[in-house]
Amino acid sequence: MDNQVLEQKIVNEEYKIWKKNVPYLYDLMFSHTLEWPSLSVQWFPDVRRDEEAGRTTQRLLLSTHTSGSEEEYILIAKVEFPDEFDESLNEEVGGDMRLKIIQRISIMDEANRVRYNPSACNVLAVRSDLPDIHVYDYTKHLSHEKIPRPDMVLRGHSAGGFGLSWNHLNPGELAGCGEGGEVCVFDVSQESSSISPTVVLRRHETAVNDCAFSFFDKKLLSSAGDGGMVVLWDTRSEDCIHAIEEAHTSDILSVRFSPLDGNVIATSSCDGSVKVWDRRSLSQPLHILLGHSKDVVSVEWSPHNDKVLASGSTDRRVIVWDLGQAGAEVPEEYKAEGPPEMKFLHGGHTSTVCDISWNPAEPFEIASVSEDNILQIWQMPQPE
């Protein structure tokens, strides 16, 4: 039996064990097979209640990655949560929840990342393998349009990539990064269909894999990339405030400012670690979180708890971390299960976890997507 067959057998066995234990591990678990993989997932902020039907409806922003097999789309889905779950419907995990794609917007190339503008959620930015960032206003597009018609094209990058970050404090400002090594900042509030960057930031000598604006300082931007370097920028003066040359021992794939603490930054890397930094003292990380066995693709802070963050990996796992537990004593019999700050391990995916998003309306609930077309919405047990 070759290694690939053996690995798949192990994955299948692990999944069977996980599925059997779902009722004991989760407050909520919903799994849905998409037509194509989505490399991107993000909860919209709106929540609609139907008291009569006893249901809550939320929306998710997704995309397609068909590898050239079909047209590519941005997808907007609605998810209906019943107040009470009917156990008899739970042959499929989360059987009485419903997910429906309510809008498809044709795009030029398969999306690496799609993010809505927090100041105007109808405005969506798409980062792909094309150099330009395309912006769509979903109120101006009919579903099933066959020809991609971006409302704005943001020019300035020399190559495609993954990094996209809207500025929560400066409406219409968007940063992007990619394989070309530059970080570009755009103002999409301009009345133009073709927009050049207001700022181009250069310090990285190789690919920049992610960028993120601060939630507390509108001119503070972070970027991270190949070679393990993190850079903090002042976008107004265009200065590099600080560079951590070797924040990780391998390429950094994700960087995020905490939405609840203006001094804290998280990074994740191909070295299998997540690190948490205080920007006032960047010589050493505050925390090094070890629990993944492969590349850590994404890291996202909880919007509800300043000590909690989650990470997704090519090891098929999502781990929720609680920094408040760092350094706590662990009984000998539990040490093999992971460090004290590992709050929860989600083992429902059987392929690389591409992206994760915390539900802003529901504490400890996460949407995660994987390379094998699976979208999962899950809620770990609530703390007492």
Swiss-Prot record:
<comment type="function">
    <text>Regulatory subunit of the histone acetylase B (HAT-B) complex. The complex acetylates histone H4 which is required for telomeric silencing.</text>
</comment>
<dbReference type="Pfam" id="PF12265">
    <property type="entry name" value="CAF1C_H4-bd"/>
</dbReference>
<feature type="repeat" description="WD 1">
    <location>
        <begin position="156"/>
        <end position="196"/>
    </location>
</feature>
<dbReference type="Pfam" id="PF00400">
    <property type="entry name" value="WD40"/>
</dbReference>
<dbReference type="InterPro" id="IPR050459">
    <property type="entry name" value="WD_repeat_RBAP46/RBAP48/MSI1"/>
</dbReference>
<dbReference type="GO" id="GO:0005737">
    <property type="term" value="C:cytoplasm"/>
</dbReference>
<keyword id="KW-0853">WD repeat</keyword>
<dbReference type="InterPro" id="IPR015943">
    <property type="entry name" value="WD40/YVTN_repeat-like_dom_sf"/>
</dbReference>
<dbReference type="InterPro" id="IPR020472">
    <property type="entry name" value="G-protein_beta_WD-40_rep"/>
</dbReference>
<protein>
    <recommendedName>
        <fullName>Histone acetyltransferase type B subunit 2</fullName>
    </recommendedName>
</protein>
<dbReference type="InterPro" id="IPR019775">
    <property type="entry name" value="WD40_repeat_CS"/>
</dbReference>
<feature type="repeat" description="WD 4">
    <location>
        <begin position="291"/>
        <end position="331"/>
    </location>
</feature>
<keyword id="KW-0677">Repeat</keyword>
<dbReference type="GO" id="GO:0005634">
    <property type="term" value="C:nucleus"/>
</dbReference>
<feature type="repeat" description="WD 5">
    <location>
        <begin position="348"/>
        <end position="384"/>
    </location>
</feature>
<feature type="repeat" description="WD 2">
    <location>
        <begin position="203"/>
        <end position="243"/>
    </location>
</feature>
<keyword id="KW-0539">Nucleus</keyword>
<comment type="subunit">
    <text>Component of the HAT-B complex.</text>
</comment>
<dbReference type="InterPro" id="IPR036322">
    <property type="entry name" value="WD40_repeat_dom_sf"/>
</dbReference>
<keyword id="KW-0963">Cytoplasm</keyword>
<comment type="similarity">
    <text>Belongs to the WD repeat RBAP46/RBAP48/MSI1 family.</text>
</comment>
<dbReference type="InterPro" id="IPR001680">
    <property type="entry name" value="WD40_rpt"/>
</dbReference>
<dbReference type="InterPro" id="IPR022052">
    <property type="entry name" value="Histone-bd_RBBP4-like_N"/>
</dbReference>
<keyword id="KW-0156">Chromatin regulator</keyword>
<feature type="repeat" description="WD 3">
    <location>
        <begin position="247"/>
        <end position="287"/>
    </location>
</feature>
<dbReference type="GO" id="GO:0006325">
    <property type="term" value="P:chromatin organization"/>
</dbReference>
